[in-house]
Amino acid sequence: MRINPTTSVPGVSTLEEKNLGRIAQIIGPVLDVAFPPGKMPNIYNALVVKGRDTVGQQINVTCEVQQLLGNNRVRTVAMSATDGLMRGMEVIDTGAPLSVPVGGATLGRIFNVLGEPVDNLGPVDTRTTSPIHRSAPAFIQLDTRLSIFETGIKVVDLLAPYRRGGKIGLFGGAGVGKTVLIMELINNIAKAHGGVSVFGGVGERTREGNDLYMEMKESGVINEQNLAESKVALVYGQXXEPPGARMRVGLTALTMAEYFRDVXEQDVLLFIDNIFRFVQAGSEVSALLGRMPSAVGYQPTLSTEMGSLQERITSTKEGSITSIQAVYVPADDLTDPAPATTFAHLDATTVLSRGLAXKGIYPAVDPLDSTSTMLQPRIVGEEHYETAQRVKQTSQRYKELQDIIAILGLDELSEEDRLTVARARKIERFLSQPFFVAEVFTGSPGKYVGLAETIRGFQLILSGELDGLPEQAFYLVGNIDEATAKAINLDEESKLKK
């Protein structure tokens, strides 16, 4: 149920209907509010400050109760800027946690942390809302079967398969294709699984959020003509927002995803970009609340906060939430408490490599650095496991030989090593793939490759059956049959040129 502070029952004044307090202290985004004795709000309740500033501008700030201080005071964190607030202003206790709209009405729209649309496309149907604070599903509700979540992207499905209802860390710097990979996953999930996606932009650049929205409209992931046909809901709490909003925007996105899982019984993809910013915002709030900092200045409740978010991302008997989280690693230090705490929750890691992106191999997923707990013979089967291991071994050997090739050239290698290098280069190119969402930029149609087709293709390369085909035939194709067809076309083109 939602208690909306903007509406009141006819004939009853707001004062009689609501629990009223007054601002006692303001320290940046942290407000202390005094309430009458016996009228204290609960932890996590949403409070609304309404009034006018000194210039007469309307103020409407929502806060969340974090601590009960005693002496009838509560300490709260604001979800928007506190400019213009003054001591003594009235604060209304809504009597419930923050609630946000959920369901089909959210598709194709952009929301802020409070669940308010920020895309200038009119109001959203708020008849179905859900509180952002919920407990994780009980043990008895969980679906613990190990099953692979097929993405249709060759390199991911073969070498670092995603678990249905699992959590995946997406590691990559700027400009290596994180956004395009995220959009392709959203597109493929919608087509292959009939599922929807929720994107939570946590503390990232506003420009990037805008770019993502524009690219989604261009590629058809968001359908402007008919929003209900869209495959994604977007929730943004960008870098410019106060720490309270950045700390809670992940929960807003998760709440929308939970509705699609529990009520609509779908397989949902939840993207969080960037999970490090969630921790960073929690650290800022923790210091402002006066808690003693822990290691490296992080909040003492780091593991608890991370756990309360991550434990809600899971498979139940109804459906699943599979989460892909971009992870920023501060100063490339993997032992920093923020990434170290995140690693404990991940089932797979997809590492994007600048070296591969520079070669034009997209998706630029590093086949050797990317890992998955699902890549075990008892889960994926002996054939898949063996093929993946041989692909990795061949790629690793090629990597070891690169220094020798750079100094002495290919001719100095043994016959066996030359064969390994030739196959590794074919594998490297065959791991690239044309994306549906990149069609508008590249002009080449996207390809969804099933897991069985992927395994068959790499087995043919490893067995040596395709040693006679040129390398470029394997670049940016779908399955292996397309590579052989491309080789024939290349051969015919070269004959025509002669």
Curated annotation (Swiss-Prot):
ATP binds at residues 172-179. GO terms for cellular component: chloroplast thylakoid membrane; mitochondrion; proton-transporting ATP synthase complex. Its EC number is 7.1.2.2. Keywords: ATP synthesis, ATP-binding, CF(1), Chloroplast, Hydrogen ion transport, Ion transport, Membrane, Nucleotide-binding, Plastid, Thylakoid, Translocase, Transport. It is a peripheral membrane protein. Pfam families: ATP-synt_ab (PF00006), ATP-synt_ab_N (PF02874), ATP-synt_VA_C (PF22919). Its main location: plastid. One of its GO terms (molecular function) is ATP binding. One of its GO terms (biological process) is proton motive force-driven mitochondrial ATP synthesis. It comes from the Eukaryota. InterPro entries: AAA+_ATPase, ATP-synt_VA_C, ATP_synth_F1_bsu, ATPase_a/bsu_AS, ATPase_alpha/beta_chains, ATPase_F1/V1/A1_a/bsu_N, ATPase_F1/V1/A1_a/bsu_N_sf, ATPase_F1/V1/A1_a/bsu_nucl-bd. It catalyses: ATP + H2O + 4 H(+)(in) = ADP + phosphate + 5 H(+)(out). It is found in: Plastid, Chloroplast thylakoid membrane. Produces ATP from ADP in the presence of a proton gradient across the membrane. The catalytic sites are hosted primarily by the beta subunits. Belongs to the ATPase alpha/beta chains family. F-type ATPases have 2 components, CF(1) - the catalytic core - and CF(0) - the membrane proton channel. CF(1) has five subunits: alpha(3), beta(3), gamma(1), delta(1), epsilon(1). CF(0) has four main subunits: a(1), b(1), b'(1) and c(9-12). This is ATP synthase subunit beta, chloroplastic.
